[in-house]
Amino acid sequence: MAPTKPSFQQDPSRRERITAQHPLPNQSECRKIYRYDGIYCESTYQNLQALRKEKSRDAARSRRGKENFEFYELAKLLPLPAAITSQLDKASIIRLTISYLKMRDFANQGDPPWNLRMEGPPPNTSVKVIGAQRRRSPSALAIEVFEAHLGSHILQSLDGFVFALNQEGKFLYISETVSIYLGLSQVELTGSSVFDYVHPGDHVEMAEQLGMKLPPGRGLLSQGTAEDGASSASSSSQSETPEPVESTSPSLLTTDNTLERSFFIRMKSTLTKRGVHIKSSGYKVIHITGRLRLRVSLSHGRTVPSQIMGLVVVAHALPPPTINEVRIDCHMFVTRVNMDLNIIYCENRISDYMDLTPVDIVGKRCYHFIHAEDVEGIRHSHLDLLNKGQCVTKYYRWMQKNGGYIWIQSSATIAINAKNANEKNIIWVNYLLSNPEYKDTPMDIAQLPHLPEKTSESSETSDSESDSKDTSGITEDNENSKSDEKGNQSENSEDPEPDRKKSGNACDNDMNCNDDGHSSSNPDSRDSDDSFEHSDFENPKAGEDGFGALGAMQIKVERYVESESDLRLQNCESLTSDSAKDSDSAGEAGAQASSKHQKRKKRRKRQKGGSASRRRLSSASSPGGLDAGLVEPPRLLSSPNSASVLKIKTEISEPINFDNDSSIWNYPPNREISRNESPYSMTKPPSSEHFPSPQGGGGGGGGGGGLHVAIPDSVLTPPGADGAAARKTQFGASATAALAPVASDPLSPPLSASPRDKHPGNGGGGGGGGGGAGGGGPSASNSLLYTGDLEALQRLQAGNVVLPLVHRVTGTLAATSTAAQRVYTTGTIRYAPAEVTLAMQSNLLPNAHAVNFVDVNSPGFGLDPKTPMEMLYHHVHRLNMSGPFGGAVSAASLTQMPAGNVFTTAEGLFSTLPFPVYSNGIHAAQTLERKED
């Protein structure tokens, strides 16, 4: 039997050897392990824990590596550049991925779907056929290259940025151009809530536009913090995020009007400087224009409500509210108004585009010149301006002085006096968008011409009397036998003797009575008769003095006599004294004996004769004078002077789109012009003669009065008077009712060189040719084409300076043509310029030759050295050679900017403005530094 091995307690040397190898700092920490050969201590608790931690770290490192690899693989799938995705953290990758997936659902499930183009090949197509089609397609490479950068090109062309919100108000997508206008990152905004970047005072409005409802108390909190401009919207908690509202009225979501959105909000911006914005520091006013997107309804029933998926928006940042950055452009003028829109200053340039002067509008409120249908929109813009400091109005109509309106869009900014903070005013910049429309058509009581009071009453009364009748003169030749019988009965049953007794005073006072028939049973007609009797006494004198302005406005409408009072008015018209009253019965007997055709001939003749013929007829003291007037119509139209003052008989149908009970809309010029411009016009010009071009101050159509009446065929005079009647049918100075001359196409009238008509001083019917100056002489404003114009354009284009605006040139150079067709660009709202330094480096700007006016006027440039500086400046603006943004101009000299395509002008060219003028160019570095100082 082999000897046993001594135990651990029996062998002290062995115990010391094990202790030296494994020191035991504390006996309680030692673990006893039983082995087959005895009990001994192998390791400590700390060593075992270290081994376990190391193994756990290795497993976690391996797991994180695999996780990061998957995250980075997911980041590569995001539609972002690799330089951005490689720097994203995991949370951003997940946030962007969720937003991208929601955006795909937003695009595919919305109405209409955005996946119109098929992503894959058509079914049952082999791979070989697909490859052959790609190789055979000549435009496959061009389309691939073009569409690869199409989105970025569109975003760069926009004067703003684009984003899409879901129904919760989170950014599903926002373009990278947001960094140019707000200084914020696309990665930072995508997937975040829009309420974290909107001013607290605008949270309620933003939620309403999205169709959301705020939690209880959220609106009051926003209103309280709206007054504090420095408060931040990012401090709002997640519980305060607005909740989507359930659509309870699906009918309201089906019309396009309720889906369109246009409003102003203030968003965070890191580009704004302290003290620049008045209402809120660190925020920019953004103009939001977009449309709500609905989910595609799979059910055909109309009871299924439409669910709002979100909002698609194009955002424009308004320029900072600094008074010294008003950019001067063509077809615009600047006004300064106080806080209640009372005009306190206006540029003199307003008279170049309208028939108003600064004296006419200073001291009045803007609401005085705004069309009645546009007042509500201006009121909303006024409220936005007071709450947010800036706004851009919708398109509205600015009423003219003599009738009509011009379409305008305005940009308003509140400016505070640096010396007196309590003094505030508004810079109101107006951009003209159209020509004057509905010229000489009064649409407001302020547009009525300044006529003598009694004459104005006469014309309005005669028109209201004509409206009170059920039948008009247009049914004169086609009336039925029943109305003939009624007319004969009324004529045969009347007694001339009581008429002389009743209307004796009226015949003594009236020199020129109305031809219209009046019903004795109509109280309105009797009231109008009284005013007519008091007002017509001064008509002959007015016709002699200023008939060029008044003759065409007195429009008479003739109807059949139905009562004794009607014939009494007709008798008063031909009798002027007591001796003439005695011959009244004989005149009536002769009229009754004549046929119906002779009566119609008499009515036409009396309307054509005007006031001159009326005075001639009234001078007769016997019935023979009246009969002589009936059988000799051509004699009254022999002299041109008498023809120019004739009153015109017209056939007036029911007015279109006008209230018959309103005295303003019943004004004769308005009724006539609306009738001539209606698609179912009852009048037409004679086909035997062409339309002469408007010439002279008194050339037809009423001369300087501005109202031109077309004569119908049914009331034309006999062939002997066609020449005199044709002179009255020409279309005059109205831009909307004017026809082109014979040389041009009447279906496509040429555009003018500017969106306004020429001054009437150049000719009586100025602007009738569409593009030339008024009258028949050469255009004075046509000097925009200076000497060597074509060579100058070729030199500018060859020097890579600018691509000139294309316009049609008729003839050799169109220097002698007065009706040359041109293309002009109207002024538009200029939003805030993009920060060029954020979009590209300074050395990446396009290489182009900066043009200075001194260099352009030099002999080496090839232009006429005698060309005026102002003319050259306007010509440069017409060619659209200036850059898109405003650059500063030194008042001392013409400084050349470092960036290309910049034109600089001296402030002396616009000395009428009370503030510095900035031309269109890219902001330079020294300009920004000077603004900060």
Swiss-Prot record:
Q: Does the keyword Nuclease apply?
A: no
Residues forming the bHLH domain are 51-104
One GO molecular function term of this record is:
protein heterodimerization activity
Bias (Low complexity) ranges = 225-251, 505-523, 742-754
Q: Name one GO cellular component term.
A: nucleoplasm
Q: Per UniProt, which keywords does this protein have?
A: Chromosomal rearrangement, DNA-binding, Nucleus, Repeat, Transcription, Transcription regulation
Query: What Gene3D superfamilies is this protein classified in?
Result: Helix-loop-helix DNA-binding domain, PAS domain
Show the ranges annotated as biased composition (Gly residues): 695-707, 761-778
Output the Pfam families linked to this UniProt entry.
bHLH_HIF1A, PAS, PAS_3
Biased-composition ranges for Basic residues? 596-617
Q: Region (DNA-binding): which ranges? A: 53-64
Q: Does the keyword Repeat apply?
A: yes
Chain residue ranges for the region called Disordered? 1-24, 215-253, 452-549, 562-641, 657-725, 742-780
**Annotated PAS domain residues:** 147-217, 319-389
Q: Which residues form the PAC domain?
A: 363-406
State the tissue distribution: Ubiquitously expressed in the adult brain.
Question: Which first-to-last residue range defines the signal peptide?
Answer: none
Subunit structure, interactors included: Efficient DNA binding requires dimerization with another bHLH protein. Interacts with ARNT; forms a heterodimer that binds core DNA sequence 5'-[AG]CGTG-3' within the hypoxia response element (HRE) of target gene promoters.
Give the disease entry from the UniProt record.
A chromosomal aberration involving NPAS3 is found in a family with schizophrenia. Translocation t(9;14)(q34;q13).
Q: What is the protein name stated in its UniProt record?
A: Neuronal PAS domain-containing protein 3
Question: Which organism is this protein's natural source?
Answer: Homo sapiens
